[in-house]
Amino acid sequence: MKKILNDPYQYVDEMLAGLCSAHPELYRQAGEAGRVIARSEKIKNGKVGIVSGGGSGHLPIFTGYVGQGLLDACAIGDVFASPSVDQMADAMREANGGAGVLRLYGNYGGDVMNFDMAGEMLEMEDVESSTVLLADDVASASKQEREKRRGVAGMGYAFKIAGAAAEEMNNLNEVTRIAQKTADACHSVGAALTPCTVPQAGKPTFEISDDEMEMGMGMEMEMKAR
């Protein structure tokens, strides 16, 4: 797969800088490492903030969902890698309007661990927060083990619905309730038509024929449950 890149090891930072340079009316970089993308305008006082985050390589998730009535900020990790605890904490600080912050993201081990620790950090700064996990991928675990399912396409619906609830100035408990109701109602399955090429690796992650597709594959090329 051909790509236009300067340096495959720097492309995430260059991508984020380019995004904010191209659309300063929508986005700004934040955080010590510049790995937080936040809304360009300051969050309204008394509004619940909504944050998400995860690895790069899933556009338009996550940066494409930062905006009015959507996410207030997101933390961006390397390709297929979770953002750090500090980056997630920075995203939460950017989204804090004094009414608490909802952490709304996919059910992936590294993201869960780091967002939980970021929430604990913000709690020490007197910032209240809550969590809703998206686990809509029916191919990744059985119905009896739904808590193990990954979050994929359902994130887009949850961002929009929870974002609208926050924009209407509902409190944190109500925004969390609406987000959880949305998450519980989302079910999806992935279909991979072609393999992806991680820039640092320079070769496809798997092989698939032109007349085939892989059903149930995750966003980071995880296989479906057997």
Language model region names:
Residues 1-49, 210:
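N-terminal amphipathic/basic leader segments beginning at the initiator methionine
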Residues 2, 48-55, 71-74, 100-109, ...:
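Short glycine-rich or small-residue beta-strand-to-loop segments that form or flank ligand, phosphate
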Residues 58, 67-98:
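Glycine-rich oxoanion-binding loops at beta->alpha junctions
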Residues 74-79, 123-148:
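Short, acidic/small-residue loops that bind anionic groups at enzyme active sites
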Residues 85-107, 113, 141, 146-160:
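A structural-propensity feature for long, helix-poor, extended segments
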Residues 140-149, 159-220:
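Internal, active-site/partner-interface "lid" segment
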